[in-house]
């Protein structure tokens, strides 16, 4: 990952990036953010308190403990979500984009190349890899917890909970190829209704014991820890479920902007969530047996079935946001050189960001089905949930510390307080979730480790391959001079040769010359470069350099969220005097076959893994939207 150039990352720049918008615009974006950004954390009331008082480390049900847990939930939401993410980390944007990769890019601006930069970059990539494990668990636990409400209505539904949940999840993944553009616009209003229902149910519960509002006092949390230190620490492993999904608001910042996300949190999401937790707490105080499922027992009997339907819809929306996030993250990884090309389908002609990656979709579906069948209940799945999120939150805190210290110019004391407070909270939650590793927490860690290995192996393998190709490449200026001494026959048309290095002669060009004995009238050496910014403006899309003997060098620039459409980019070359007639243009692509060798620069197992990944990578023609009838592939064998 390269350091960003020309990006102002000061707080003032961040504020300018999110300048005041019309009130109606902010309101509309805030409603949309409620549907996409807060779906995950918005479904947490379905299972959080149930797990606190019923999980493997269940907290004894006493009034003092109920107050203590509710106080912990409140201050976790305040410190982690409100303070750390909404007020601080969202200010560290990459030209309006958020997410752990954007944060890593900002960090690398402030750190010179070396071991420290490598460690920070690896942390960022590992944090991104952990998202996939979380993306597998979120749909499973969310939908299961919603459908389990049927058991509250009548125990006769118990045998059908698992099949219904599996049917809902399979249906969700099967329809992904059709896109969500037509129904996506209702996500915000539906989730807004969901949060209103959470608040109304919570207020109804609070009327049973209005004094429950006193749980906002942090002394209840402190007293809870003082009276039962071990139980208090272990309870954090379940309390953390209340903040899972909080990290998503930073990742989705590019879609909505900082202000709408902040408004949605403080005006709708936070109040609704905590009112519902207070209502559940009051219900437990009224009847301790209600801990078996306090969310659904808060619902009037006549409304349980409609609420199950509404909760299922809310969890589907929450799952959709995670699934779409996995597609987006995969595409960014491809653009930044961390993942091989994969088939990507754009599901909307109007929204460039709406994509579908079949291989990721079916991988997620297989994992989600395995999780549901293997764990069989949301309570069992809760053991696997949280550890990846808390680890990601720790990584965010460490990277944000570098940003506030090196880029924002905070003093040691101010930055130290930032790191000390938030890291202490993150470590407390993470340490409590580590006791769940054997009970299921191993799953997201294993997935994260595997994805991290794949991402870093591809990145390292491509670096070694490009280095090898450059070593064996003839310098371009030498080759062009030789054309004057021994000119080759020319044919009409334009030949475009894709290359990773514009100073050398592509192997495909040499093979074409050796086998066909001709050169085209115009020879274009084209390289695609991806910057560590989300988007590159059209005015900076291409750079053209005319050389001797009909040769041209063309550099095409993209951001990591741009669609790499080469034919569209080449149209802009006309501004530089280089016009392309697509039916008179041939694209020559090299199809390398890799052969392993001793001393390649990677361990033997990793080298073999890279070769397998390289062999199964998607077609460059498909990835760059090159018309198939204009493509010529020339094979070559390369020792890695």
From Swiss-Prot:
The lineage of its organism: Bacteria, Pseudomonadati, Pseudomonadota, Betaproteobacteria, Rhodocyclales. This is Probable potassium transport system protein Kup. PANTHER family: LOW AFFINITY POTASSIUM TRANSPORT SYSTEM PROTEIN KUP, OSMOTIC STRESS POTASSIUM TRANSPORTER. It is found in: Cell inner membrane. Belongs to the HAK/KUP transporter (TC 2.A.72) family. It comes from Aromatoleum aromaticum (strain DSM 19018 / LMG 30748 / EbN1) (Azoarcus sp. (strain EbN1)). HAMAP family: Kup. The keyword Transmembrane helix applies. The gene is kup. Its main location: membrane. Transport of potassium into the cell. Likely operates as a K(+):H(+) symporter. It is a multi-pass membrane protein. It holds the Pfam family K_trans. The keyword Nucleus does not apply. GO terms for molecular function: potassium ion transmembrane transporter activity; symporter activity. It comes from the Bacteria. GO terms for cellular component: plasma membrane. The chain crosses the membrane at residues 26-46, 69-89, 117-137, 155-175, 186-206, 224-244, 265-285, 297-317, 355-375, 384-404, 415-435, 437-457. It catalyses: K(+)(in) + H(+)(in) = K(+)(out) + H(+)(out). Keywords: Cell inner membrane, Cell membrane, Ion transport, Membrane, Potassium, Potassium transport, Symport, Transmembrane, Transmembrane helix, Transport.
């Amino acid at each position: 990952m390269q350091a960003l150039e020309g990006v102002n990352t000061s707080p003032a720049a961040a504020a300018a990036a999110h300048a005041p918008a019309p009130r109606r615009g902010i309101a509309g974006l805030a409603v949309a953010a409620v549907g996409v950004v807060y779906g995950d954390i918005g479904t947490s009331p379905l299972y959080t308190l149930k797990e606190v008082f019923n999980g493997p480390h269940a907290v004894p049900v006493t009034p003092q403990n109920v107050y203590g847990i509710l106080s912990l939930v409140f201050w976790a939401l305040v410190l982690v979500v409100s303070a750390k993410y909404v007020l601080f980390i969202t200010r560290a944007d990459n030209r309006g984009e958020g997410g752990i990769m954007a944060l890593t890019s900002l960090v690398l601006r402030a750190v010179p190349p070396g071991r420290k930069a490598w460690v920070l970059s690896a942390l960022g990539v590992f944090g991104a890899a952990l998202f996939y494990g979380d993306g597998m668990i979120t749909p499973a636990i969310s939908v299961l917890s919603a459908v389990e409400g049927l058991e509250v209505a009548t125990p006769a539904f118990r045998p059908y909970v698992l099949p219904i949940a599996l049917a809902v999840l399979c249906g969700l993944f099967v329809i992904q190829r059709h896109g969500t553009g037509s129904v996506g616009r209702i996500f915000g209003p539906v989730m807004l209704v969901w949060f209103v229902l959470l608040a109304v149910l919570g207020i109804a519960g609070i009327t049973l014991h209005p004094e429950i509002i006193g749980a906002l006092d942090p002394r209840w949390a402190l007293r809870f820890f003082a009276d039962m230190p071990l139980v208090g620490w272990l309870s954090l492993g379940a309390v953390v479920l209340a903040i899972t999904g909080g990290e998503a608001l930073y990742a989705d910042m590019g879609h909505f902007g900082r202000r709408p996300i902040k408004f949605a949190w403080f005006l709708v999401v936070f109040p609704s969530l905590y009112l519902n937790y207070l209502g559940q707490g009051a219900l437990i105080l009224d009847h301790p047996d209600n801990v078996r499922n306090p969310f659904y027992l808060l619902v009037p009997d006549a409304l349980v079935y409609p609420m199950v339907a509404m909760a299922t819809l809310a969890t589907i929306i929450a799952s959709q946001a995670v699934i779409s996030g996995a597609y987006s993250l995969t595409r960014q990884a491809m653009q930044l050189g961390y993942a091989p090309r994969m088939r990507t389908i754009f599901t909307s002609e109007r929204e460039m960001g709406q994509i579908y990656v079949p291989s990721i979709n079916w991988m997620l579906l297989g994992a989600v089905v395995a999780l549901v069948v293997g764990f069989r209940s949301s309570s069992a799945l809760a053991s696997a949930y949280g550890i990846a999120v808390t680890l990601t939150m720790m990584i965010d805190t460490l990277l944000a510390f570098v940003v506030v210290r090196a880029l924002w110019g905070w003093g040691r004391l101010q930055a130290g307080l930032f790191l000390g407070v938030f890291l202490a909270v993150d470590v407390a939650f993470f340490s409590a979730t580590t006791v769940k590793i054997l009970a299921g927490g191993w799953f997201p860690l294993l997935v994260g480790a595997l994805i991290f290995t794949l991402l870093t192996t591809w990145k390292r393998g491509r670096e070694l391959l490009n280095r090898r190709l450059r070593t064996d490449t003839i310098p371009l200026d030498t080759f062009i001079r030789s054309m004057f001494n021994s000119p080759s026959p020319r044919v009409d048309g334009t030949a475009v040769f894709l290359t990773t290095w514009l100073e050398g002669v592509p192997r495909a060009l040499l093979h074409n010359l050796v086998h066909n004995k001709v050169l085209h009238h115009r020879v274009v050496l084209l390289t695609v470069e991806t910057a560590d910014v989300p988007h590159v403006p059209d005015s900076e899309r291409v750079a053209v350099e005319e050389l001797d003997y009909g040769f041209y060098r063309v550099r095409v620039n993209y951001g990591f969220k741009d669609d790499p459409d080469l034919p569209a980019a080449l149209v802009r070359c006309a501004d530089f005097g280089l016009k392309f007639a697509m039916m008179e243009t041939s694209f020559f692509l090299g199809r390398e076959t890799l052969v392993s060798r001793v001393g390649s620069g990677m361990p033997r197992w990793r080298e073999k893994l890279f070769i397998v990944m390289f062999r199964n990578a998607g077609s460059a023609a498909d990835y760059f939207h090159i018309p198939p009838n204009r493509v010529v592939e020339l094979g070559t064998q390369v020792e890695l």
